[in-house]
């Protein structure tokens, strides 16, 4: 387990990942679907062995995208909070070297009487070894 005081930390950010899915409370949302936008930020400490230019030392952002896309297209959620939680749990299971995950899930087309640009939910998870000072930034 890496030391929380390690001097190096890699951050991976995927911004504005767009997908069409059928999440939401309303029957129309289940039938028609809509666009969702996701921002992902995750971090890990590098391995203690000497760094090489190999994918095994990092987390593939292509695989991160694929895991998120697969989950969003194969399951239906009524709540953005439930979808955000499922994404975090999937990424924790598939990428055990991740020590910090932040998911911000945007729903641009909100079926409300009020005028707004979007609704969004953010969920942050950090391992017990993750420094608290970094988790709140």
Residues covered by each model-derived region:
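N-terminal, polar/charged subdomain of small-to-medium soluble alpha/beta proteins
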Residues: 1-137
């Amino acid at each position: 387990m890496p030391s929380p005081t390690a001097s190096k930390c890699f951050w991976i950010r995927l911004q504005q990942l767009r997908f069409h899915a059928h999440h939401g409370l309303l029957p129309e949302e289940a039938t028609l679907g809509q666009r969702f936008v996701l921002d992902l930020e995750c971090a890990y400490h590098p391995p203690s062995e000497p760094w090489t230019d190999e994918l095994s030392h990092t987390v593939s952002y292509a695989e991160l995208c694929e895991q998120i896309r697969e989950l969003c297209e194969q399951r239906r959620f009524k709540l953005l909070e439930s979808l955000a939680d499922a994404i975090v749990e999937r990424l924790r299971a598939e990428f055990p070297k991740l020590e910090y995950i932040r998911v911000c899930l945007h729903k641009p087309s909100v079926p409300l009487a009020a005028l707004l640009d979007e609704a969004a939910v953010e969920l942050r998870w950090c391992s017990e070894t993750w420094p608290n000072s970094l988790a709140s930034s």
